[in-house]
Amino acid sequence: MDYEIRQEQKRKIAGFHMVGPWEHTVKQGFKQLMMWVDGKQIVPIEWIAVYYDNPDEVPAEKLRCDTVVSVAENFVLPDNSEGVIVTEIEGGEYATAVARVEDHDFATPWYQFFDALLQDSAYQITSEPCFETYLNNGVEDGYWDIEMYIPVRRK
């Protein structure tokens, strides 16, 4: 899989923190997020899923993720936004790759990306969270084009 190393700025994000199997929690989290964004007339910059754990090491019921939108730096949480978190994705060096997800198979591109990056002789993966941004509306299109971000540092 082709990827590039880029310096990313921090992102201010707002949305929902979820715990459990990602195939359920990400979908549930985005349903909640869409209702909140529509109901509060939030203007998102990007739609993002943030992943905190390695699914090969953490039991599915303990996997953590955030389903969020990136927002302007001066964003203020609207009243009656129970359960919504406002936090940041750290800036820094990230390996980035674009993939098309079909049949709801988000895992395969991530595994391919990690496999390619683990062979990199100049960069190593760090322990900060990974995330993906959505480049289209997969519900309407029947597939998702995503950009994946894995935090790295020079070896």
Swiss-Prot record:
One of the record's GO molecular function terms: DNA topoisomerase type II (double strand cut, ATP-hydrolyzing) inhibitor activity
Natural source organism: Salmonella arizonae (strain ATCC BAA-731 / CDC346-86 / RSK2980)
One Pfam family hit: GyrI-like
Compartment(s) where it occurs, according to its Swiss-Prot or TrEMBL record: Cytoplasm
Assembly: Interacts with DNA gyrase.
Keyword check for Transit peptide: no
InterPro entries to which the protein is assigned, alphabetical: AraC_E-bd, DNA_gyrase_inhibitor, DNA_gyrase_inhibitor_GyrI, GyrI-like, Reg_factor_effector_dom_sf
Disulfide-bonded cysteines: none
Entry annotated with the keyword Cytoplasm: yes
Protein name (record): DNA gyrase inhibitor
Keywords of the record: Cytoplasm, Stress response
